[in-house]
Amino acid sequence: MSKTAIIFPGQGAQKVGMAQDLFNNNDQATEILTSAAKTLDFDILETMFTDEEGKLGETENTQPALLTHSSALLAALKNLNPDFTMGHSLGEYSSLVAADVLSFEDAVKIVRKRGQLMAQAFPTGVGSMAAVLGLDFDKVDEICKSLSSDDKIIEPANINCPGQIVVSGHKALIDELVEKGKSLGAKRVMPLAVSGPFHSSLMKVIEEDFSSYINQFEWRDAKFPVVQNVNAQGETDKEVIKSNMVKQLYSPVQFINSTEWLIDQGVDHFIEIGPGKVLSGLIKKINRDVKLTSIQTLEDVKGWNEND
């Protein structure tokens, strides 16, 4: 029996003009976009559509923008009937909306706060991330341990696919790894355009503030399992999910294990909902046999709704 998982991208997928094609062209998507504009304390639609002030790349804006785009696409799709859902990092919040763990309005407030706390904890230039290509997890972990000291750390942060491990930590060590990468055996090390050391233990400084903030919202048991980044398991219990979303701040994203867990459950079709095809590209490198569908635009939505 064929099973389907809907999956959602995280930071890095944003681009100017995102979701503009949906606005006023699809009632369900427009409702989500309008709701985001009413709920948030900044002009999210201007930031997404034109970004005249150049603020889309700031994490406190990127996070609600991506959640809003994925949720608008999701609302516009008919006859999805997924068996599971999974998101990469920030994308996990879109999964929570999809599985009705959080309302969209609550989720968009939470990711706005998540971004603000991250930005406040690490002013630009303190922490960073980089993608290490061509090495396995054990080797990357070993390199990180050899570079880290008592006052500066670098750690594996996203275990994306074979030969692609993202590391996170103090910018000085990230820069050192970028410089030394090839001599350490990597094909290359690419710095990422992010403003903080996400998914590293450095993020524990915001754990308490974030945990107390998300406790004020209503969390519900998931309508279908959410495969969580921190443990690569499908969860439906609201308390387990909420606890894992706090741990997610400072824990590695277990994307390879999560994808393999889904395939073990019988999933043979992954539908990526949101800008870009980053996750589809990663999954191809994990398993070439699964079916991949990308829903990024109004045209993609129409194609799905007409054919399914």
UniProtKB/Swiss-Prot annotation:
In terms of domain of life, where is this protein from? Answer: Bacteria
Q: Which organism is it from?
A: Staphylococcus aureus (strain Mu50 / ATCC 700699)
User: Matching SUPFAM superfamilies, A to Z?
Assistant: FabD/lysophospholipase-like (SSF52151), Probable ACP-binding domain of malonyl-CoA ACP transacylase (SSF55048)
Report any Pfam family annotated for this entry: Acyl_transf_1
**Keyword match Cell wall biogenesis/degradation:** no
Matching entries from NCBIfam families are given as: fabD (TIGR00128)
Give the gene name.
fabD
Pathway named in the protein's UniProt entry: Lipid metabolism; fatty acid biosynthesis
Q: Name one GO molecular function term.
A: [acyl-carrier-protein] S-malonyltransferase activity
Q: What is this protein called?
A: Malonyl CoA-acyl carrier protein transacylase
